Structure formats: structure tokens, C-alpha cells
């Protein structure tokens, strides 16, 4: 088989087709970058989303693979950046090709049939396709910063109206399906639900390359204790720290545990740290209140970051080859954990898992999230994370209290 014939399987790679694919991918991804740079214009995001979806529905089939390739890289290039900290920088180009290739195949299948209604249905279902368990490809997230509702129902109505716009042959009929769009406007709660007590949400800026060094670790612990003392003086009821804010196996450091338990007599403390038990490592959240300690382990691990999502017989050789024999983290087999403070339940989530539907079982009123985004600094990952958190906050009417390292912390309301 000739090389050109092999390429033809993946579509048309002539400049015109590639240009159309690249333009479509830019439209499909631009909202993330605008959000990253702090652009807040719901009308702009609304128009951009409608234009991106309309363009997608009419994209030439031959441009499908290239479109998906560029979308995959535009959305998820930052995944490769974490390999810098494993001395695997040489793998970054191959990881980017892999990311682009996976989404190139997915979108080439979604765009194989030219009927806009079929394409709309497949895009509507795309968030349920999770390569290796990675579930951040949620197309409707582009509606979160807009005037439009990001629910599945509204997203479906938007896709239906745009599909019918393209399908109706008479020009005078084309505006009629667009009359569905006003029914997809987002109705924001008049008064967002906030915890009935004062919360200090910590934002840190600690580079990943130093956070585990002995000298830096001592300084980080000292700074965290000072932040707790300051929050106590300000009369706060709760202080929320990011993921692994205490960079150690916290359950093995009795003096730190005792210190935090003592301070929790005056203020509740939620912080991220690792936990070791029976030779296994867990990414955990520690809750200190009135001298008591509760621990909740992460239940949804990051594919290829905390766990290699492959059969066990492949995991150990890959860990030896690329990660010096380091073992995967272990996930708790339990369901999501709720901490309780002053009669208020706070659903716990750690970074990546806060963007997984399983953590929103029962639509909790409040969620506390700790993230360490230093792995991907600098990149658009925090912007995409905030959009996804906003998507789930809207979907479940959940108020999210988010403490982060190397990205903005804050409250994300529905």
C-alpha cells in the first residue's frame, strides 16, 4: 500500500483541507484560551459557541481527523507537561502525537457521515467517550461562560436547531429552527448558596520542582501553620488548603498531626497530603475539627498521572521503564466522602476527581476541592478545570470551594 493511500484512511491532508480543519479547531477551542486570559463576555462566548458548533456540523468529512487532532492538542497539550518532572521530557512530542491521534480518530468517526443530525447526536454523546478513563472532553463546557445553558437538554436543543438550519432547503425557513435558542438561555440562581460560616480559601504558588525538597518542605509547613494562625485571628470557621499542601506522608508525621489537631480546637482545617498504609500510597484529604481527624482518600485517579490504566501485567514493566519502579497510587474503593461542619455537609474531592460525575452523586450542596496545578504550569489547564467545575456546579446546583496551587482559588457557584 502506498504512503498516500495510508494517509487517505485518515482523510485529506492537502493544504485546503488542513486549513479548514485548523480553522474549525480554533473555533472549537478558543473559549478556553479566552477564559485563560480573563475575558468575561457572555455574549461573545455565546456567539463563538454557536459559530463553532455550526461550523462543526458542516465540516468536510475529509477534514475530520485533522480537526480532531488539533482539537485534542488545543484542549489537552498540557497533559504532556507533567512528564518534565519525571525526567521524561523527550517523550513530550510522542505524547502530543498520541493525544492528537486519539481525538483525531474519535472526531473522524463522528464526522464520517455528512448528515448534520447524525453529527449532532454523536457530538452530544461524545462526553460519554472516555479514552483510558479520561473524561475532560465535554463539548458542552463551551457554554459555561456564555448566556446559554450547558445542560445536556439545552446542548441537544442547540445542536438540533443548528442541524435543522443546515438541513432546511428553503432560505426563508432556515431562521425557524433558531427560535429554539431562547429556550436554551441559562437561568442563574438569584442568590447562590454559600456556607453559613466564614471560610479562608488558600491559594499557593509553589513550583512543583521544589515542593518535595527537604528545605522547601520545612518552609512550606511553617507557612501553612502561619496561615492557620492568621485565619484564627480573623475569626474564620474553616481554612481550606490545596492538594498535598503539606508535602509529606502526613499520617507518618505525628508532630504535624498533633499540631494541626491542636489548632483545630479553634478552627476547622481541611488540607491535602499523602497517606501511606501497608505499603500503599494514597492521595488524601485530612479534616481536622475539635481535635478529631478524618481522612478521605482520592477515589478517581488521574490516568497515566497517578495510575496507568492498563492491564496489571503491563503496569509494572512500564513503571520500571519510565518511572524508576515507582508504584501507582491507590484509590479508595469507597463512595465519595462528606465532611460535616456545624451541621453542613461538605463533599470532598481532590483535583481531577472534582470533574468526574461520580463525585456529584446526590447533588451535594457544597463541595471542597483541593488542586495542585503546578504539574501543568504554565498552561491553560486551570482554565479548563474551572470551566469543568462550573459545568458540574451548574448541573448539580453545587457550590464549589476550590483551593489551588499555582492557579486561582475561589468559590465557583452554579
UniProtKB/Swiss-Prot annotation:
Pathway: Protein modification; lipoprotein biosynthesis (N-acyl transfer)
GO CC term, one of those recorded: plasma membrane
Transmembrane regions: 19-39, 40-60, 63-83, 91-111, 121-141, 153-173
Record bears the keyword Cell cycle: no
Active site: 243, 298, 351
Any GO BP: lipoprotein biosynthetic process
Membrane topology term: Multi-pass membrane protein
UniProt xrefs under InterPro entries: Apolipo_AcylTrfase (IPR004563), C-N_Hydrolase (IPR003010), C-N_Hydrolase_sf (IPR036526)
Domain CN hydrolase stretches: 202-414
EC number: 2.3.1.269
Cellular localisation: Cell inner membrane
UniProt keyword Transferase present: yes
Keywords: Acyltransferase, Cell inner membrane, Cell membrane, Membrane, Transferase, Transmembrane, Transmembrane helix
GO molecular function: N-acyltransferase activity
Family: Belongs to the CN hydrolase family. Apolipoprotein N-acyltransferase subfamily.
Annotated function: Catalyzes the phospholipid dependent N-acylation of the N-terminal cysteine of apolipoprotein, the last step in lipoprotein maturation.
PANTHER family: APOLIPOPROTEIN N-ACYLTRANSFERASE
UniProt name for this protein: Apolipoprotein N-acyltransferase
Organism for this UniProt entry: Wolinella succinogenes (strain ATCC 29543 / DSM 1740 / CCUG 13145 / JCM 31913 / LMG 7466 / NCTC 11488 / FDC 602W)
Species lineage: Bacteria, Pseudomonadati, Campylobacterota, Epsilonproteobacteria, Campylobacterales
Gene expressing this chain: lnt
Amino acid at each position: 500500500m502506498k504512503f498516500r493511500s495510508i494517509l487517505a484512511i485518515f482523510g485529506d491532508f492537502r493544504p485546503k483541507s488542513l486549513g479548514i480543519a485548523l480553522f474549525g479547531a480554533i473555533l472549537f477551542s478558543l473559549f478556553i484560551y479566552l477564559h485563560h486570559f480573563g475575558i468575561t463576555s457572555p455574549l461573545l462566548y455565546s456567539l463563538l459557541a454557536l459559530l463553532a458548533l455550526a461550523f462543526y456540523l458542516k465540516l468536510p468529512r475529509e477534514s475530520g481527523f485533522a480537526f480532531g487532532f488539533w482539537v485534542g492538542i488545543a484542549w489537552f497539550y498540557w497533559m504532556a507537561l507533567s512528564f518534565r518532572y519525571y525526567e521524561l521530557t523527550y517523550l513530550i512530542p510522542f505524547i502530543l502525537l498520541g493525544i492528537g491521534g486519539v481525538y483525531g480518530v474519535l472526531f473522524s468517526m463522528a464526522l464520517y457521515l455528512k448528515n448534520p443530525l447524525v453529527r449532532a447526536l454523536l457530538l452530544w454523546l461524545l462526553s460519554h467517550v472516555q479514552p483510558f478513563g479520561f473524561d475532560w472532553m465535554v463539548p458542552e463546557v463551551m457554554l459555561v461562560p456564555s448566556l446559554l445553558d450547558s445542560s445536556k437538554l439545552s446542548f441537544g436543543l442547540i445542536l438540533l436547531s443548528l442541524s435543522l438550519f443546515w438541513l432546511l432547503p428553503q432560505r426563508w425557513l432556515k431562521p425557524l429552527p433558531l427560535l429554539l435558542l431562547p429556550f436554551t438561555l441559562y437561568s442563574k440562581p438569584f442568590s447562590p448558596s454559600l456556607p453559613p460560616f466564614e471560610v479562608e480559601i488558600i491559594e499557593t504558588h509553589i513550583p512543583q520542582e521544589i515542593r518535595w525538597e527537604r528545605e522547601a518542605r520545612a518552609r512550606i509547613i511553617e507557612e501553612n501553620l502561619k496561615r492557620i494562625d492568621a485565619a484564627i485571628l480573623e475569626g474564620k470557621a474553616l481554612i481550606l488548603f490545596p492538594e498535598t499542601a503539606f508535602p509529606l506522608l502526613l499520617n507518618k508525621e505525628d508532630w504535624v498531626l498533633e499540631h494541626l489537631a491542636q489548632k483545630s480546637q479553634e478552627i476547622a482545617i481541611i488540607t491535602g497530603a499523602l497517606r501511606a498504609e501497608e505499603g500503599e500510597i494514597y492521595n488524601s484529604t485530612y479534616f481536622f475539627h475539635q481535635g478529631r481527624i478524618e481522612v478521605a482518600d482520592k477515589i478517581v485517579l488521574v490516568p497515566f498521572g497517578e495510575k496507568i490504566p492498563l492491564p496489571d501485567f503491563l503496569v509494572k514493566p512500564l513503571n520500571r521503564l519510565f518511572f524508576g519502579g515507582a508504584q501507582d497510587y491507590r484509590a479508595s474503593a469507597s463512595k465519595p466522602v462528606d465532611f460535616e461542619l456545624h451541621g453542613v455537609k461538605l463533599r470532598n474531592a481532590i483535583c481531577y476527581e472534582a470533574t468526574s460525575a461520580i463525585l456529584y452523586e446526590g447533588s451535594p450542596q457544597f463541595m471542597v476541592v483541593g488542586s495542585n496545578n503546578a504539574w501543568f504550569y504554565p498552561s491553560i489547564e486551570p482554565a479548563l478545570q474551572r470551566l469543568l467545575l462550573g459545568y458540574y456546579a451548574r448541573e448539580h446546583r453545587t457550590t464549589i470551594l476550590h483551593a489551588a496551587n499555582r492557579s486561582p482559588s475561589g468559590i465557583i457557584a452554579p
